[in-house]
């Protein structure tokens, strides 16, 4: 089971993402953006990791979205192969039009705007541990394949532009109706509170992650590779054995591929 971890200039999370892929028993490989894109077809799945591709120039993800490798990823997505875009990877998937519907750019991941009590308390880059509620049906999405609806995960964010917005409210309504909202920022009890610090970036409907209509492509702003091992979790004595909740994202991809093959 071969997984390509796509590396663009400025990507900075490829190595820890590769560790997560391999720890789950998949054969991971860093795939540079300037390799012959036809070689991508040899892989069973793909992860576009976080970082700041092309230094986020113009806007986050837009330059990487124009690279030839993304046209090939679009074709592989149409063939049903799983893709997970994390943070900048999510931004690239949105800018390329693969998410949300595969028919062009319908969303934007705008600058973070933190609102509390009706007032803007902060803008821009924010790094913190967040709580996510899994809002999709079980097996609806390749990147959350093993999660139950309503399951709560603690996974960190680190971004300046994760505020998911749409100029047309019908786009958001379609995401809701088609069960494409995979993760939403929530309280520790699972409540959806549209206010900072629960909604960490001002995202519409507290959206933290979405899928395409077919469910094989997931884009999410939080970083599961940073919550993969238990020692990464925020505790007084962090070096404990075992795994954190982020592992479930990568295990989901593996299970999705296995069941798709059978």
Swiss-Prot record:
Molecular function per GO: ATP binding; glutaminase activity; phosphoribosylformylglycinamidine synthase activity
PROSITE patterns: GATASE_TYPE_1
Native source organism of the sequence: Methanothrix thermoacetophila (strain DSM 6194 / JCM 14653 / NBRC 101360 / PT)
Cited InterPro entries: Class_I_gatase-like (IPR029062), PRibForGlyAmidine_synth_PurQ (IPR010075)
Name of this protein: Phosphoribosylformylglycinamidine synthase subunit PurQ
Active site positions: 87, 223, 225
Reactions listed under catalytic activity: N(2)-formyl-N(1)-(5-phospho-beta-D-ribosyl)glycinamide + L-glutamine + ATP + H2O = 2-formamido-N(1)-(5-O-phospho-beta-D-ribosyl)acetamidine + L-glutamate + ADP + phosphate + H(+); L-glutamine + H2O = L-glutamate + NH4(+)
Annotated metabolic or biological route of this protein: Purine metabolism; IMP biosynthesis via de novo pathway; 5-amino-1-(5-phospho-D-ribosyl)imidazole from N(2)-formyl-N(1)-(5-phospho-D-ribosyl)glycinamide: step 1/2
Entry EC no(s): 6.3.5.3, 3.5.1.2
Principal place of residence: cytoplasm
One CC-aspect GO term: cytoplasm
Purpose: Part of the phosphoribosylformylglycinamidine synthase complex involved in the purines biosynthetic pathway. Catalyzes the ATP-dependent conversion of formylglycinamide ribonucleotide (FGAR) and glutamine to yield formylglycinamidine ribonucleotide (FGAM) and glutamate. The FGAM synthase complex is composed of three subunits. PurQ produces an ammonia molecule by converting glutamine to glutamate. PurL transfers the ammonia molecule to FGAR to form FGAM in an ATP-dependent manner.
Subcellular localization: Cytoplasm
């Amino acid at each position: 089971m071969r997984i390509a971890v796509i590396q663009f200039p400025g990507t900075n999370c490829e190595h820890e993402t590769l560790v997560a892929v391999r720890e789950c028993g998949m054969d991971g490989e860093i795939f540079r953006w300037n390799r012959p894109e036809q070689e991508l077809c040899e892989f069973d799945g793909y992860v576009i990791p976080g970082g700041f591709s092309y230094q986020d120039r113009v806007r986050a993800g837009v330059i990487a979205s124009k690279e030839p490798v993304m046209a090939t990823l679009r074709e592989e997505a149409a063939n049903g192969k799983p893709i997970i875009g994390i943070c900048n990877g999510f931004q690239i998937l949105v800018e390329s039009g693969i998410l949300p519907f595969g028919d062009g750019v319908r969303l934007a991941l705008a600058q973070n705007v933190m609102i509390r009590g009706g007032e803007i308390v902060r803008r821009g880059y924010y790094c913190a541990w967040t709580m996510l509620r899994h809002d999709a049906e079980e097996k609806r999405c390749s990147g959350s394949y093993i999660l139950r609806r309503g399951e709560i995960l603690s996974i960190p964010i680190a971004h300046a532009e994760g505020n998911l917005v749409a100029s047309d409210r019908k786009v958001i309504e379609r995401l809701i109706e088609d069960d494409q909202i995979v993760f939403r920022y929530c309280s520790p009890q699972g409540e959806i509170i549209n206010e900072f610090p629960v909604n960490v970036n001002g995202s519409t409907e507290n959206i933290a992650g979405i899928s395409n209509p077919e469910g094989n492509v997931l884009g999410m702003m939080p970083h599961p590779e940073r919550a993969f091992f238990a020692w990464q979790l925020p505790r007084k004595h962090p070096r404990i054995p075992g795994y954190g909740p982020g592992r479930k994202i990568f295990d989901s991809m593996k299970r999705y591929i296995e069941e798709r093959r059978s």
